[in-house]
Amino acid sequence: MKRKETFGFRKSKISKSLCGALLGTAIVVSVAGQRALAEDMTTSTTSAVDTTAVVGTETGNPATNLPEKQADSSSQAEASQAQAEQKTGSMPVDVATTELDEAVKSAAEAGVTVSQDETVDKGTVGTSQEADEKSGEIKADYSKQAETIKITTETYKADVAANQSETNRINQENAAKKAQYEQDLAANKAEVERITNKNAQAKADYEAKLAQYQKELAAVQQANSDNQAAYAAAKDAYEKELARVQKANADAKAAYEQAVAANTAKNEQIKAANAAIQQRNAQAKADYEAKLAQYQKDLAAVQAGNAANEADYQAKKTAYEQELARVQAANAAAKTAYEQAVAANTAKNEQIKAANTAIQQRNAQAKADYEAKLAQYQNDLAVVQAGNAANEADYQAKKTAYEQELARVQAANAAAKTAYEQAVAANTAKNEEIKAANEAIKQRNAQAKADYEAKLAQYQKDLAAVQTGNAANEADYQAKKTAYDQELARVQKANADAKAAYDQAVKDNQAKNAEIAAENAAIRQRNAAAKADYEAKLAQYQKDLAAVQKANAANEADYQAKKLAYETELARVQKANADAKAAYDQAVKDNQAKNAEIAAENAAIRQRNAAAKADYEAKLAKYQQDLTQYQKDFADYQSKLKAYEDAQAAYKAALAELEKHKNDDGYLPSPESQPFIFEQEKNATLEITSGDKVYNADEFYAEADKLDYIKADTLFNTEKRRVAYEHFKGGIQDSADWPGKRVFLPKGKPVVARYSNLKNSELNGKKIASAEFIYTLKDTSLNADKIPAMLYDDPTQTIYYFEFFGSQSIDVDIKFYDEDGNKIDATGALLDFSSLNRGHGWPQYNGINTIEKVNYHTGTAIEINGSSVKDNGDGLYAATPNYTKANQSRFESNEWDTTNSPVNWYGAIVGKQTGPDIKFTLSAENASGIWFAFDSKIKAKDIPNKPMESEPTPPVAPTQPLEPVYEVEKDLEPVPVEPNYDPEPTPPTRTPDQPEPNKPDEPNYEVEKPSEPAPIEPNYDPEPTPPTRTPDQPEPNKPDEPNYEVEQPQEPAPVEPKYDPEPTPPVDPVYEKIPDPVNVPTVRYHYYKLAIQPGVTKAIKNSDNLDIDKTLVAKQSTVKFQLLTADLPAGRPETTSFVLVDPLPSGYQFNLEATKVASPGFDTSYDEATNTVTFTATAETLANLNKDLTKTVSTIYPTIVGQVLNDGAIYTNNFTLTVNDAYGIKSNIVRVTTPGKPNDPKHPNNSYIKPHKVNKNENGVVIDGKAVLAGSTNYYELTWDLDQYKGDSSGKESIQKGFFYLEDYPEEALDLRPDLVKITDTSGKAVTGISVTDYASLEAAPEMVREMLQKANITPKGAFQLFTADNPQAFYDTYVVKGIDLTIVTPMVVKAEMGKTGGGYENRAYQIDFGNGYESNPVINNVPKIDPKKDVTLTLDPADLTNIDGQTIALNQTFNYRLIGGIIPPKHAEELFEYSFDDDYDQTGDKYTGQYKAFAKVDFTLKDGTIIKAGTDLTQYTKAQIDEVNGRILVSFKEDFLRSVSVDSAFQAEVYLQMKRIAVGTFENTYVNTVNGITYSSNTVRTSTPEPKTPEDPRTSHTVVYRPIKDKTYQPAPPQTGQLPATGDANNAYMPLLGLVSLTAGFSLLGLRRKKN
């Protein structure tokens, strides 16, 4: 690769924006860019072409010039191409008739009848050579006709005299023969009449029986059909209704059983709850009775007053007993009704059983009864269903009410139980409290008891008298009782208060007994009056207490009596209900078991019935199928029988006819028949099972072309090769009528073609299903070991193989197989070997010595009378030429060598198989291609097909099956009705005891509280009676299906009688024919007409006049169309007009002037609206054509010149020739394409030519759109898209326009690295022959480059890099025509200045091929601005943003320089390898303390996914170099750490350098941030230190001299809060832990320089 340098002005292309915004560019087309294409053409054009049109944004074409999509073809072009190669009309060819005219005239004068036949049409030929041949044939025939007419005329005169004498002799002999014949004929007529009458009677009897049979058959079939349809309909309705009823009953039963189960479970729960209640009640009762004993002692007197309660109890008891009797009566009535229902059901079932018996007896009329009962059944079923629905609704309503009542009772009982249990618990707790209180009271009352007993004795003595007086007090008792209750409450409270006071008083009393003694005397005096009052009240109390106790005793006795009766009745009811339930449960269980048995038995019955029905229906279906088949077979049998008889008769007649003609031309010498039918199999499927490759047409032609069968080593052989290969190409194209597979026949290796799906063929009475054709190439004269062949999908079209004027022999082995895959014996088959030509071909290439042969190996050859093909011992072929009469042939080839020719036997021979396999060898010599068709269509005349040998067998009629008698299913037992259980009696209610009268309080005594009375047992509501389901009505009895009468099998149709044959009539006597009078002979003659349709050919050439048909050329290439016409023949009419019209394809730029120059002899006109050019022969040209009409004349042709102007376009074209307005012909279609057609169905991977560009980093990673650091190298990879040009046929003028690739790079952002440029091909091989030149601007480029870019409509924005193919032809031959893409890698370095300003830059490229430009995609990148900052801080906290830049720092104050590095944005193009902080501080004012820290300024991510948060201490990943002598510190991040940062992550760090101010003055400081080799300066900070106000004490200065030591990586100490890591020693001798190093020598190596203020 050569390199050139050019310098000049540059123009800015950079946008200084960190986001990399793309600047829009307006494309301006200069006036200079509008130049006409005539600059590149040898002649001027009619219209200029703008080759600088902008990129086709709408079409998607990246072309910079001529981007337009090819427009649709004109309607004229489409119509012309749709009629390609079609012809209309013709030109007549005249032949002289003088000799024939004279012979006709002479015959008429001699008395011979002369008749002129219709003029014979000799057809229409296509070439003047063929016209000359036909004219010669016509002349010869005219001479032959003239000679025949002369001979006929002379013979006629001699025959007339001899005819009369012979006629007289024959008449006498014929009269005797006629008399005998008439006698025999009368006898025969009588016999014929007798036999005819007999046969007529037999036929009438047969037809009568046949008519009766068909009538009866139709009636039986209709009856069976009606019966079956009615039965099926009724049965279907019954089964649907039965299924519905059974499902409804099953659902109802399931719901009922669920309700029963739920009720049972609920009752069990209630029963368990009641049992628990009874247990608790029993316990409560025991407790109660114990308490009651004590209570009864105390209430004996009160019970006497309760006698009135007895009357109330008796009334209630009477009512209870009446209700109990009513319930028991109702239960008895329900039970009776249930038993009656069961009995009625049983009786009903018995009735149904009896009715079923009667029904079975009446089945003779079953069908009518069945239908009537079925209707009644459906009505009854509807009633039952309605009743069941009503029962269900009633049941559901009762069930709902029952469940609601049950829920209410259970809730009430639960509440009562809860209240009762709470009362018991409260009572127990209260009694325990009272018991405890009573114990205390007893202790306190021990002393008082003695006093009380003494007083009681006196009280009882006085009580008797008091009780008598208290009778009057009863009336006001109740009023007093109310007051008593109120007073009692007050007293109880007072007593409680008194007790508390008393307790205290007791304690006080024990201390003050002495004082109390005096007080007691006074108390006793006061108590005397109280005692009198008390005793009076006590007497009344005792009287009232006795009355209450008496009444309560009566109540208790009444309650106990009622309770005993209740418990007795409850036990009875519960036992009765339990017994009823057990009986019901057992009945249900028995019912379920019984119904299970019935259901199982019914299931078995249904199964047996279903099996019987299925078997019957299967047999019936089989019978009906067999009957249908029988009827069909019988009809088929009759047809076959008739066909057999007709075929036998026709066969015998045909053999007899062949016998008559066995010596005639076209017939076989002995009668033969054909047992082989193999005429057409259009739907056959062809497979090449030998594994040989099947080619498409292009592959096939390419492979044959590569084999080079005819070497083009001489001019003669070149033309011979062209003709042979054109013939080959035409013979291998796809055709809807002749589909096939293209294979090569290798020498010595069989190629097996297997045909399946054969439908129309037979062999020896067996159907042919498949066949195998095995071809083996034995020998070939070609210089190759294989030859091409077309094997057609229809095996009767067979094979078309190509010889290329050589000779070959091919063994053919054919096997036929039946439908079971068995091979069929071919013995006896007649094989057709026809169209065996000899003496045809191209004289200049094979000397008309072509010969076609067959060597038949598996049978005998039978020669056809008169055929030119004979068995010559070494094969079957024509011993002499049979192509033209001029070469000894009896017929012309076009007379016999067609499928429908009546004399096609002339080139045929027949082979008769004597063995099971078919084998023969095909061979030919000196032919271009041979079509061989193997079929059974024998060319010998009237060969009949051999009929089947045996008479067809009549079918056997099937036997109809009998319908089975189905078993009847049993009805299920009805479900027992659940009994109505007796409700439990209502327990008696205890009459509450009367309260005891208030006993007067003993004075000063605390009375024991009585026990709380036991709570009264709650009155439980009786459980409601669950609803009783109304039993479902039983399903109505299904009527039994009638036992149908079994149909009698049909009588077989009467067989047509064998009629007596008529007697053979007497043979007509053979009269000796009297000689006809000598007829006046008629001589016939005819004239001929001949026409010609001269052919036309359209050729397409490039600028080098090379054929480019069906190839591609570059856009803007010159394409020339040649409109060729064949020679015009002798005998043609005068040519008065000769016009050629060519509708040009769209996108083709026609050059009128150049076309006129290339088309002398024609007037040329152009219609721009239709893009059509017309050529009209000039008068001079017409004169040359008409100069001598008796001789063949050659024509001249015009040439169209123009350019193709579209990418990815297809240009197809043909033209029309019109001669004398009588003959017209459309030419062939030629085609040329331009590269880059998208969505081309023949080349689906095509696309527009599009150069491609990507930006990669040094590791080959694509970095398009990513941030690129200054100093980085961009490795731009450019693709030169050349694969679309593969197979290009452009001319040299297009190639010489050159091949270029332009890189339009932004020179403001990038510096070229031409030393690193690489160019490779798709295999990675280095490309040579390309020069690369750098131009500073378009103006700096040479004129040739500027002109080339202007024509391609490409304007670089500034500097550009141009790659140029040094030798366009060599470059074209090496890469373009082979379609090899090239890859250019051109590295460029981002300028350092870009890092300081930041901004985006854009880059794109162009390729220019053949003068056509194509634009690549743009590549855009951003350069981040690196802007380091410097602050002065007093703290180490990264979150503290306080900056004291510009402020005052005290002398000896410690502070920090904060160095903030530039931010590296996310998604940067390459790894970081350098990131450092270089601080050149003023050591005269600042002293480094030896301590620094590095922190993350932003969150960033490592390659392993670790996230480092902002503020993280990064000191351990750094190293420091210190030069205190010169005031220099360099802190650098380790390279391995930097490279571990993900390129998808941002990165920024900051460093704190701790300083101490050691001098007075103003000090400035700036640091340098280095990123990947590029340095960036920070801002400058300034701080001032004033003179201290108070001088410091003088100190003895201590100077420490540091010696430089080797660099040491920083190892941080554990951080301390608020302090930097110390790097000095304990005496602050300024020795940092990391090791301070004096690096004077080291910095000099690094090139560091100190900055002074």
Swiss-Prot record:
Pfam families: Adhesin_P1_N (PF18652), AgI_II_C2 (PF17998), Antigen_C (PF16364), GbpC (PF08363), Gram_pos_anchor (PF00746), Strep_SA_rep (PF06696). Residues 982-995, 1012-1034 have a biased composition (Pro residues). Residues 56-93, 107-137, 975-1073 are annotated as: Disordered. Residues 1624-1653 form a propeptide. A motif (LPXTG sorting signal) lies at residues 1620-1624. Transmembrane segments: none annotated. The keyword Repeat applies. Residues 1-38 form the signal peptide. The keyword Protease does not apply. InterPro entries: Adh_isopep-form_adh_dom, AgI/II_N, Antigen_C, Cross-wall-target_lipo_motif, Glucan-bd_C/Surface_Ag-I/II_V, LPXTG_anchor, SA_I/II_PAC_V_sf, Surface_Ag_I_II_A_rpt. Residues 72-86 have a biased composition (Low complexity). Its main location: secreted. It is found in: Secreted, Cell wall. Residues 206-616 are annotated as: Heptad repeats of Y-[EQ]-X-X-L-A-X. P repeats lie at residues 960-998, 999-1037, 1038-1066. The modification Pentaglycyl murein peptidoglycan amidated threonine is found at T1623. GO terms for cellular component: extracellular region. Residues 996-1011 have a biased composition (Basic and acidic residues). It is a peptidoglycan-anchor. Keywords: Cell wall, Peptidoglycan-anchor, Repeat, Secreted, Signal. Belongs to the antigen I/II family. This is Probable cell-surface antigen I/II. It comes from Streptococcus criceti.
